């Protein structure tokens, strides 16, 4: 990576939505106006005490925040080395971190007078969270989901429908998350007058990367205060899984200026980087443009986006949020690839030692947390963002292991 020197990581993005050489708005002319309108509305809302109060009230009373930090004592003993701590985003209403963002964006949609929200989803958690807040606020909700992901996440598809959402299968391309995002953006261009697009990750054109980060930053702010209150200090290291990267940046952001905290992002290495069947945009990708922003992407020598693979639908995406690309280049965050088999092993070990079923996405972070812990002393603290629960993945894991459920 480069020799970028950063004095204050909280100073990004700049006024044009750039994180160093990443980010920006690489979109069709028809989207420039709607994006400017959205940016102006968001900037006004985030400085409005009434909006912030309403958002914080929903986080407390509807989402159930704060989420606790749990000391995984049996897992720590089994792994050996450092103490493993879990930030329990899986305990939120709807079962993942996604609701932190959808609550904020739905409140913004209502403030802007929009009556319809659309969303894309991979693992289904963002779709469920979007359908949930739409039901609460009385908004129409349409969720775009790749046909491949619909097959491996049927429980979440049914949950969305129970909540009143329309789920639209996307069959183009690889029929996964990137294709769902493409279709959602087409819908938004066509119906922008009354429609608000709730992007679920820190990707897309400005202002989405910063807006989604800001709504998820509650995770890191809570964790920082909890670490100081419960342990008297910050963690020695932390990990989170990275697909688009919303849960990760939500945790990382509060700690970016704390040089003593080592930060790691766990990308999906799938069947292994060398096989080409992976979704590791930073570890094995290169700079390019995808979904309206410049970032790291999985592409060929001509810049064409390649199909990706991960056992985890939520990490099966050929790009990453531009802030993560910037953090990788600056050296502040180290990104590693975790293979499917490593994530599955971590899933089972956490279940057996702590009675917690982690999402397959989160299991990538758990796997790297265990690797870090083994090489650290017993009094070291490693914090892992347990971004979601694994109920949605039981059928996928059972099928992979030849079990009928």
Swiss-Prot record:
Keyword DNA-binding: no
NCBIfam families: trpB
Domain of life of the native organism: Bacteria
Keyword Iron among record annotations: no
Homology family: Belongs to the TrpB family.
Cited function: The beta subunit is responsible for the synthesis of L-tryptophan from indole and L-serine.
Subunit organization: Tetramer of two alpha and two beta chains.
GO cellular component, one term: cytoplasm
Protein name: Tryptophan synthase beta chain
Species for this entry: Xylella fastidiosa (strain Temecula1 / ATCC 700964)
CDD domains the UniProt entry points to: Trp-synth_B (cd06446)
Classification via SUPFAM superfamilies: Tryptophan synthase beta subunit-like PLP-dependent enzymes
Signal peptide limits: none
Catalysed reactions, as listed in the record: (1S,2R)-1-C-(indol-3-yl)glycerol 3-phosphate + L-serine = D-glyceraldehyde 3-phosphate + L-tryptophan + H2O
Keywords: Amino-acid biosynthesis, Aromatic amino acid biosynthesis, Lyase, Pyridoxal phosphate, Tryptophan biosynthesis
Alphabetized HAMAP family for the sequence: Trp_synth_beta
EC numbers, comma separated: 4.2.1.20
GO molecular function: tryptophan synthase activity
Enzyme superclass (EC): lyase
Co-factor(s): pyridoxal 5'-phosphate
């Amino acid at each position: 990576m480069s020799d970028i020197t950063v004095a204050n990581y909280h100073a990004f993005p700049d006024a044009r939505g750039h994180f160093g050489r990443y980010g920006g708005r690489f979109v069709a002319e028809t989207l420039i106006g709607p994006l400017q309108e959205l940016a102006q509305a968001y900037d006004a809302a985030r400085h409005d005490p009434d909006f912030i109060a309403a958002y914080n009230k929903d986080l407390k009373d509807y989402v159930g925040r704060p989420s606790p930090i749990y000391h995984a004592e049996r897992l720590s003993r089994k792994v050996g080395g450092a103490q493993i701590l879990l930030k329990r985003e899986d305990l939120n209403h709807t079962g993942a971190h996604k609701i932190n963002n959808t609550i904020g964006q739905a409140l913004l949609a209502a403030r802007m007078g929009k009556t319809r929200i659309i969303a894309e989803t991979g693992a289904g958690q963002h779709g469920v969270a979007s359908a949930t807040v739409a039901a609460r606020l009385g908004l129409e909700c349409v969720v775009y989901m790749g046909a491949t992901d619909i097959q491996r996440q049927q429980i979440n598809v049914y949950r969305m429908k129970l909540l009143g959402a329309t789920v639209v299968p996307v069959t183009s391309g690889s029929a996964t998350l990137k294709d769902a995002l493409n279709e959602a953006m087409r819908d938004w261009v066509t119906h922008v007058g009354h429609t608000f697009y709730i992007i679920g990750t820190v990707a897309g054109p400005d202002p989405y990367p910063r807006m989604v980060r800001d709504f998820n930053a509650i995770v890191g702010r809570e964790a920082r205060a909890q670490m100081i209150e419960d342990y008297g200090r910050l963690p020695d290291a932390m990990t989170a899984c990275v697909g688009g990267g919303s849960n990760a940046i939500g945790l990382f952001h509060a700690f970016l200026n704390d040089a003593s905290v080592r930060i790691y992002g766990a990308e999906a290495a799938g069947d292994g980087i060398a096989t080409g069947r992976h979704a590791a945009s930073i570890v094995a990708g290169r700079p390019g443009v995808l979904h309206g922003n410049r970032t790291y992407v999985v592409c060929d020598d001509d810049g064409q986006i390649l199909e990706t693979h991960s056992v985890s639908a939520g990490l099966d995406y050929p790009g990453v949020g531009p802030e993560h690309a910037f953090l990788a280049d600056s050296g502040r965050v180290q990104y590693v690839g975790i293979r499917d088999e490593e994530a599955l092993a971590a899933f089972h070990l956490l279940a057996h030692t702590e009675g917690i079923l982690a999402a397959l996405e989160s299991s990538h972070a758990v796997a790297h947390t265990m690797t870090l812990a083994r090489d650290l002393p017993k009094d070291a603290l490693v914090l892992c963002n347990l971004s979601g629960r694994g109920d949605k993945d039981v059928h996928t894991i059972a099928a992979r292991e030849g079990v009928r459920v």
